[in-house]
From Swiss-Prot:
Protein name, entry field: Glycogen debranching enzyme
InterPro entries per the UniProt record, alphabetical: GlgX_C, GlgX_Isoamylase_N_E_set, Glyco_hydro_13_cat_dom, Glyco_hydro_13_N, Glyco_hydro_b, Glycogen_debranch_bac, Glycogen_debranch_GlgX, Glycoside_hydrolase_SF
GO biological-process terms attached to the record: glycogen catabolic process
Annotated metabolic or biological route of this protein: Glycan degradation; glycogen degradation
Organism field: Yersinia pestis
Residue numbers annotated as active site: D338 (nucleophile), E373 (proton donor)
Keywords linked to the UniProt accession: Carbohydrate metabolism, Glycogen metabolism, Glycosidase, Hydrolase
UniProt key word Nucleus: no
Length: 662
């Protein structure tokens, strides 16, 4: 018969010390916490936690070993109007578990209990927490420590990036192991990618609504266990755990000089709204973990049914501990925070919020690359430019300005230039560096680059929501024909804009983020919200990749790394050597010229040597070049002999870079 001794309130979670397992669980409002141990046959033993220190319940299991399955039952008041939803009939997952065994199905035993406790026991249906204790030989692994000024981010999904790669063994495709495969690493190195940003690899589940439709949460933002590696992306090879496989991938990428950033989800949990499943925090301490309205309802500022209360001292520490676990255990180099405004809610957004202060005070985490998606859907949720020093931010204003300039002819060149210069009005006056602007034309959420040029309307019918989901504000242009089938003239204009947008992204000041597949011409058939499409719609089709576009993109990244104005991560100042803004005649743009409607032509001289020529009009133009001898540079052509170019004739929707001869 298992007996728990008092144990210790630290360390948090379930930890094997060589002689037994120490268990801890936070709950400020519980009246009793019961540890539930399960054997291999699923038989349950319930043991009351024998000690409480402050709000930490704890106990020690002598002789306990790694592999022990467990969960919790928590007793206390069921008073929804006060935010309390305790129910000992529901087995609960440890919010700090580092592994889970099993999946969460659409089981009615998880739901119910909206106005009164549901008495159906959920233990048989719930995945069990696993105590793990895995040693790992990092073999001297060190972080690549890429300076922000040299950083080029590649946003990718583990499965989508590798599932159809012909040079990766079939049994490894779609897995963490595929990320470590030489063929994938060679692609990243050839492109010039410095930093791989992975969509969530934390343990996530599929919403009941999707399960009923036979779909799944492909993107993975419905996180249940943020400390646990998602086993869905593991190869299942004997003797190799999901954690080890991810570690192997990070080590291989580091050996190639490539950083790894994880997209993490701390804005909401997989328990959804009041009608959602009771799996974890709702039953452990609902009032502490979630933002609630005065009458106890969930304050749905995320659009996902609930919002985590990250200003609570314990919840703040839970996030910090989780980030440090991923950093220490998996050697990741940074984090991208989904719906990042929630991180600073107190409940209003505050640059000095507890979580921001804790991140700044943590030497290890403050040295990581930290990236915020600077919005949520709550009051005051749009916070682009307002995150504290140490954060970079996804810049949707850059995205919309560049799309509008090239595809809609509705953005004046002054606005274009301001965002080309790392959206300086947003970041410079707030003491941030240019790298704080994460520039993007596309991301996982929205059209791919090719679809941006082929579809004026979203086509999300496969998502099962009658095309209601996804944004209608895409700033796209199909050039007169909806879809991928079009005549040669339309495709010529599309391809010109495709290259112009890639060039703009990769030669703008700030930190560029390239969506995986955009360099290949990947299409999602007009679906701009493919969160539930775990199929060939989202998987990159390496067999039909546009090789010429891949070469073009690689040449652009190499060019970027040669231009000091783009890599030194310092603001451009009027009159310095970093930048000169010129008109189509090669003359400095006057203040009046900046304000002349939607002028779509300009020249940008970077570091006194690289001349970016821009014709975003729908007709050919001729530009007079500044004084000097100019020649083409890859990927824009190379002169076979010395030639003094005085003019440049540019086709519609084109951009070109020339280099000044010494």
């Amino acid at each position: 018969m298992a007996v728990l001794t008092h144990g210790s309130p630290t360390p948090s979670g379930a930890h094997f010390d060589g002689k037994g397992i120490n268990f801890t669980l936070f709950s400020a409002h519980a009246e009793q916490v019961t540890l539930c141990l399960f054997d291999e046959q699923g038989q349950e033993r319930q043991i009351a936690m024998p000690a409480r220190t402050g709000d930490i319940w704890h106990g020690y299991l002598p002789g306990g070993k790694p592999g022990q399955r467990y969960g919790y039952r928590v007793s206390g008041p069921f008073e929804p109007s006060r935010g309390h939803r305790f129910n000992p009939h529901k087995l609960l997952i440890d919010p700090r578990t580092r592994a889970l065994e099993g999946k969460v199905g659409d089981d009615p035993r998880f739901t119910g209990g909206v106005s009164q406790p549901d008495v159906r026991d959920s233990a048989a249906a719930l995945p069990k927490c696993l105590v793990i204790h895995e040693e790992y030989d990092w073999q001297g692994d060190k972080p690549p420590a890429i300076p922000w000024g040299n950083t080029v981010i590649y946003e990718a999904h583990v499965r989508g990036l590798t599932q159809l790669h012909p040079d990766i063994p079939p049994e490894l495709r779609g897995t963490y192991a595929a990320l470590a495969h030489p063929a994938l690493i060679e692609h990243l190195k050839t492109l010039g990618i410095t930093t791989l940003e992975l969509l969530p690899v934390q343990f996530h589940i599929d919403e009941p609504r999707l399960q009923k439709m036979g779909l799944s949460n492909y993107w993975g933002y419905n996180v249940l266990a943020p400390f646990a590696v998602d086993p869905d992306y593991a190869s299942g090879r004997e003797g190799i755990s999901p954690l080890r496989e991810l570690r192997d991938a990070v080590k291989a990428l580091h050996n190639a000089g490539i950083e790894v950033i994880l997209d993490v989800v701390f804005n909401h949990s997989a328990e959804l709204d009041v009608f959602g499943p009771t799996l974890c925090q709702r039953g452990i301490d609902n009032a502490s973990y979630y933002w609630l309205t005065p009458d106890g309802e969930y304050d749905n500022i995320t659009g996902c049914g609930n919002a985590l209360r990250l200003s609570h001292p314990y919840v703040t520490q839970w996030v910090i501990d989780c980030l440090n676990y991923w950093r220490d255990s998996c050697h990741v180099d940074g984090f991208r925070f989904d719906l990042g405004t929630v991180l600073g809610r107190t409940p209003a957004f505050d640059q000095h919020a507890p979580l921001f202060a804790a991140l700044a005070a943590d030497e290890r985490l403050s040295a990581c690359k930290l990236i915020a998606e600077p919005w949520d859907i709550g009051l005051g949720g749009y916070q682009l430019g307002n995150f504290p020093t140490g954060f970079s931010e996804w810049n949707d204003q850059y995205r919309d300005a560049m799309r509008g300039f090239w595809l809609r002819g509705e953005v004046p060149r002054g606005t274009f230039a301001q965002h080309f210069a790392a959206s300086s009005r947003l970041f410079e006056q707030r003491g941030r560096l240019p790298s704080a602007s994460i520039n993007q034309i596309t991301a996982h959420d929205g059209f791919t680059l090719l679809d941006l040029l082929c579809f004026n309307q979203k086509h999300n019918q496969m998502n099962g929501e009658e095309n209601r989901d996804g944004s209608d504000n895409n700033h796209s242009n199909n050039f007169g024909c909806e879809g991928l089938v079009a005549d040669a003239a339309i495709w010529q204009r599309r391809k010109a804009c495709q290259r112009a947008l890639l060039t703009t992204l990769l030669l703008s000041q700030g930190t560029p983020m390239l969506l995986a597949g955009d360099e290949q011409g990947h299409s999602q058939q007009g679906n701009n919200n493919a969160y539930c499409q775990n199929n060939i719609l989202t998987w990159l089709d390496w067999g039909s990749a546009d090789r010429a576009l891949m070469t073009f993109t690689a040449d652009l990244i190499r060019l970027r790394q040669q231009i000091p104005a783009l890599t030194q991560d310092q603001w451009w100042q009027s009159g310095d050597s970093n930048v000169q803004w010129l008109d189509s005649q090669g003359q400095a743009l006057s203040d009046a010229a900046w304000e002349q409607g939607c002028q779509q032509q300009l020249q940008i001289l970077l570091s006194q040597r690289w001349l970016v020529l821009i014709n975003a009009t729908d007709h050919e133009c001729e530009m007079h070049l500044p004084e000097g001898e100019w020649e083409g540079i890859p990927p824009f052509g190379v002169s076979d002999h010395a030639e003094r170019l005085t003019t440049w004739r540019g086709s519609a929707h084109t951009i070109c870079v020339l280099i000044k001869r010494d």
